[in-house]
């Protein structure tokens, strides 16, 4: 009887394993928009070539798309976003995610409250444009390089900023993720520690 039950259990487990006829389904291949170079290269022809090379999805660099010094007019940026979405859709490439801006003066973890608030407002402005693009994911950069001994305070500020921006992300139908950073060594040099998110434990 015990052997019979074991056999049924094994059969049940095997029935849950997908059975593929021939080759398993192809996974989607994605890339950063960085492969296309400057925004002037972001054309349907470029995207179509990328699709032929096997690219199915893309992460848009918000810094490249929205923080171009020549593009300060909101209507101009909105028009660019609509054209970008049309060209990518026509080429068969999905806008999977948007990598939000980052830098010392646009740091969501800043302990200088004035800088943090400006950073949050900049992110809000970018998210309004992201609504046109309809990404699945919005990726926040956790921080710039930190001064020594700032990590706990910076983590608290990052959590605060993301909490303030979460409703804006939900409005565009996307999910928030926080970028994991490099740097197995905590200290970069005599002045700085590496950015937040450098270990799994820190992200959790």
Residue spans for each PLM region:
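N-terminal pre-domain/capping segments
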Residues: 3, 20-136, 152, 163, ...
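Bacterial N-terminal signal peptides
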Residues: 7-18
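Extended rod-forming repeat segments used as scaffolds/tethers
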Residues: 9-11, 66, 186
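Acidic/histidine-rich catalytic cores of soluble enzymes
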Residues: 24-25, 57-58, 153-204
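Short amphipathic alpha-helical patches
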Residues: 73-74, 111-112, 142, 146, ...
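Substrate-binding cleft and catalytic face of glycoside hydrolase catalytic domains
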Residues: 96-108, 139-147, 174, 183-186
């Amino acid at each position: 009887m015990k052997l019979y039950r074991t056999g049924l259990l094994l059969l049940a487990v095997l029935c849950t394993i997908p059975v593929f006829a021939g080759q398993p389904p192809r996974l989607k291949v994605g890339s950063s928009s960085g492969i296309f170079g400057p925004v002037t290269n972001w054309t349907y022809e470029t995207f179509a070539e990328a699709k032929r090379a096997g690219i199915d999805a893309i992460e848009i660099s918000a810094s490249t798309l929205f923080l171009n010094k020549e593009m300060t007019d909101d209507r101009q940026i909105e028009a660019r976003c609509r054209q970008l979405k049309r060209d990518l859709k026509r080429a068969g490439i999905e806008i999977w995610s948007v990598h939000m801006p980052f830098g010392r003066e646009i740091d969501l973890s800043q302990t200088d409250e004035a800088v943090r608030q400006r950073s949050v407002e900049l992110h809000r402005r970018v998210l309004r444009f992201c609504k046109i693009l309809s990404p699945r994911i919005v990726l926040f950069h956790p921080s710039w390089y930190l001064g020594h001994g700032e990590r706990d305070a910076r983590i608290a500020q990052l959590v605060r900023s993301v909490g303030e921006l979460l409703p804006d992300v939900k409005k565009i139908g996307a999910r928030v993720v926080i970028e994991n950073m490099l740097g197995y060594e905590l200290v970069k040099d005599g002045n700085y520690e590496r950015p937040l998110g450098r270990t799994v434990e820190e992200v959790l």
